[in-house]
């Protein structure tokens, strides 16, 4: 009987040691695992848009050290992304981040071709469209929140200019340099105007499209044209510093101010820059890389609002951030107002796309939307979907 007990104990110990040994072997294998992460950029560090993504890549490098090797392709024009993505696959990338909206169709196609590689499309909107691929994902921060806060800052400056007699309420006009008449751009400038009108209800806006994401001369020329039309605060959804330089160099009779995007323009426009907003891409990218390292599904690891293969978040998860406030130029009390507005957005106490406005689809004037009922931006997609021009308060410059 004792012999049976001894054999049983020996057998049990042997099994335990075997299990522990296997666990340690595989755990150590995963702990020592290294992967490659690829990044495809439409520009380089000279443009605010790409520089912002590069900050997120640097955050990945800092977070993972030798465990993750990052590889980047710069100045990849929309339409030329196939070769760059194929090169990243050939170089052994386990996860690839494509960072310009125009890349999405080719990126999804290549995801189907390379099922062992994870493809993450920033600003994309096609992850949940057929065919849905397990290795193709879209993500974006709810930047309309940041645009709204930027608009509040602009509104406070307009109010200050009205109160000190620099302009009248009728002159409370914003200008906006937009790249394309896409939902992403329209949603952004609408939120910006609505933020301003929460402070100055008489504020209106004029929009000038460049029809390119990044062209310094076109963006500067657009901003100059808006200033000539009487706009006193200029903002942008474009990639260069052209609007900032236009504001700083203007000799208009009325002072002109700037609200930026993606990158502070305080050095280029120290006397006109107010504030800016940006998407913080680092949380998604770091968590997606962690998911690949841990061999887990990205949507099970990234913290945000998950909708199928798509994830988004706003101020609540630090996916949207305000850039530095130029307190020398901003109206008194702006810093406190920013903090209060962000808190209200986090708590759902502000519904941005709501009010006594009628929006008109620029591609189909019979398609209108009454904002009295509110528009739930990002309800089903991290990419913006609001695509209506507000009647009577927004003009599109021809």
Model-flagged regions — what are they?
Residues 183-231:
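Extracellular/periplasmic Venus flytrap/periplasmic-binding protein
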Residues 36-56, 60, 64, 71-82, ...:
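Extracytoplasmic "Venus flytrap"
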Residues 1-31:
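Gram-positive cell-envelope targeting signals
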Residues 139-169, 278-298:
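Hydrophobic alpha-helical segments within soluble ligand-binding/sensing domains
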Residues 115-139, 263-270:
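Flexible loop/hinge segments that line or gate small-molecule binding clefts
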Residues 295-398:
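Segments of small-molecule ligand-sensing domains
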Residues 39-40, 92-101, 118-122, 229-240, ...:
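Periplasmic-binding protein-like
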Residues 57, 147-202, 302-330:
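An alpha-beta-alpha
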